[in-house]
Amino acid sequence: MVHDLLRDRADLEARWNPSAYMQFARLRQRPVVELLDHIEPCCPERIYDLGCGTGIATELLARRWPLAELYGVDSSVEMLEEAARLPIKASWERANLRHWCAERPASLLFAAAVLHFLEDHGKLLPRLLGQLTPGGCLAAHMPNWRDASWYRLMLDALDSAGPGGASLGSPALRYRLHRRNVLSLDNYYRLLAPLTAELDIWETEYLQVVDGNDPIFDWIKVSALRPVLGELDEEARRRFLDRYLELLHRHYPRELDGRTLFPFRRVFIVASLGR
């Protein structure tokens, strides 16, 4: 298992893996549907799906608003190539969301599981709101994983799996992983309420039931774990994975039916401007 993971190093460092990401497509789609259900009925003229990935949300947006101009934006060539295979009318744009600006103002900015990768939401979200038309809407959901058991275990393994219990990776890596990008719900309210006409903020915890030999790790490795496995050298990765998999198996035992329970929290925001 560990040797197979080490052979995947190049992909983990440089590329997103669409097939691995789609392994849990149904579970990844659930928060998209929940977010869509909270958007007031409207007829958006121009929609941008930020961090569109393989197009899970883009396809649902196309079904709901088939007459809208639809754009999928992502930084990964591999993800965009996969999304472009969808039988929908959409344009695809490669861009880094840290610097991205809409060519024309958006009726709807839809951001599914992407903003948590970006820091300084105090500046980011007002900047995104500034790219909306009057009456436009920013709708986002973000994994709130900073306090999740699997995330704390990842930090524990990184901090103690080195020789003699030493830490692994650079101080800069550990700093990035300890940093909180996702704010508390009340702080999002204080940030966005003065800027919007309507604001809905909530949090949902899903009890995800997953299958496989290492389903928790399979979920994590395609997203949250990429910075760790991409930075560590081969020996450090071996030490980290040995320790981390041990901790995951201990904390997330299989149920009697052979499946694994994987609680997962997400923050949702629907912020609309006045007309």
UniProtKB/Swiss-Prot annotation:
GO biological process, one term: methylation
UniProt entry tagged with the keyword Signal: no
Record InterPro entries: Methyltransf_25 (IPR041698), SAM-dependent_MTases_sf (IPR029063), Trans-aconitate_MeTrfase (IPR023506), Trans_acon_MeTrfase_C (IPR023149)
Source organism superkingdom: Bacteria
Catalysed conversion reaction: trans-aconitate + S-adenosyl-L-methionine = (E)-3-(methoxycarbonyl)pent-2-enedioate + S-adenosyl-L-homocysteine
Catalytic class of the enzyme: transferase
GO MF assignments: trans-aconitate 2-methyltransferase activity
Cysteine pairings via disulfide bonds: none
GO cellular component, one term: cytoplasm
Localization per Swiss-Prot or TrEMBL: Cytoplasm
UniProt KW Mitochondrion keyword: no
One Pfam match: Methyltransf_25
EC number: 2.1.1.144
Keywords: Cytoplasm, Methyltransferase, S-adenosyl-L-methionine, Transferase
Protein's job: Catalyzes the S-adenosylmethionine monomethyl esterification of trans-aconitate.
Family the UniProt entry places it in: Belongs to the methyltransferase superfamily. Tam family.
Name of the protein in its database record: Trans-aconitate 2-methyltransferase
Gene: tam
